[in-house]
Regions:
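N-terminal glycine-rich phosphate/adenylate-binding segment common to multiple enzyme folds
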Residues: 50-162, 166, 179
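Short, Lys/Arg-enriched N-terminal segments with co-localized hydrophobic residues
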Residues: 1-3
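N-terminal alpha-helical transmembrane segments of multi-pass membrane transport
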Residues: 5-11, 21-26, 30-57, 64-67
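Generic secondary-structure signature for well-ordered alpha-helical cores
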Residues: 31-35, 39, 69-72, 104-107, ...
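Solvent-exposed alpha-helices and their adjacent loops that cap or buttress functional pockets
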Residues: 5-7, 14, 65-68, 122-127, ...
Length: 221
């Protein structure tokens, strides 16, 4: 009987556990597909909503900094609480999206790529090459601020420079209640996103396309 030596790891894997069924599935994956073949070295972080609440979300930041250190991580799906979840889990506050927190720290790019292997047929049978979707992972809606507008009034966008320069634009004149959302991004992160996309396209030999709504959003997009 031949017993295969387990694959040795030199760099620890940052292991981010999640919520609900993902906890069960991740444990099953480790038991059935990883432990028998790999001498797993990992740094474990419990990103389940209960533990995030117990640590005042510090565990999310710790897991992101560990990922910065080691350069590799696996994250399970997590709950981003809404008002109903705050009540259900008796949370201290409505904690922010763990994905948003981690992406902001890593200044990363999200690449969503299909699994292309024999035995898994695509819906379009003659579709042989993958399509990968890249998304800028910093800022935008994940770092947005929101206001419930109570009644009539004027909403303004104001930038005050460190040199005292003030730039002001009127967003909307409300004649009744409404909502406001402010988003931002920074050139450094935008340039990093572009470099990541070009590098990924070159590494995987895929054609790179860029989509934007600059006909409407002439400065932001």
């Amino acid at each position: 009987l031949y017993i295969m030596d387990k694959i040795k790891m030199t760099t620890p894997l940052v292991e981010m556990d999640g919520d609900e069924m993902t906890r069960i599935l991740w444990q099953y994956i480790k038991d059935e597909l990883i432990y028998p073949f790999i001498d797993l070295k990992s740094e474990y972080y419990d990103l389940g909503l209960v533990h995030r609440n117990e640590t005042d979300d510090k565990v999310t930041f710790d897991s992101a900094y560990a990922t910065q250190k080691y350069g590799v991580a696996v994250k399970c799906a997590t709950i981003t609480p809404n008002a109903a979840r705050v009540k259900e889990y008796n949370l201290k506050e409505m904690w922010k999206s763990p994905n948003g927190t981690i992406r902001a720290i890593l200044d990363g790019t999200v690449f969503r790529a299909p699994i292309v292997v024999k035995g898994i047929e695509p819906c379009v049978k003659n579709w042989k090459k993958p399509i990968t979707i890249a998304r800028h992972a910093y800022g935008d809606v994940y770092k947005s601020v929101e206001i419930d507008v109570p009644g009539p009034g004027t909403a303004e966008l104001v930038f005050t420079g460190d040199d005292g320069q003030v730039i002001k634009e009127t967003i909307h004149k409300f004649d009744g209640p409404g909502v406001l959302q402010g988003q931002h991004n920074v050139d450094k992160s935008i340039e990093s996103f572009a470099r990541s996309c070009f590098k990924y396209a070159l590494d995987t030999k895929q054609t790179l396309w860029f989509a934007t709504k600059d006909t409407i959003s002439k400065k932001y997009d």
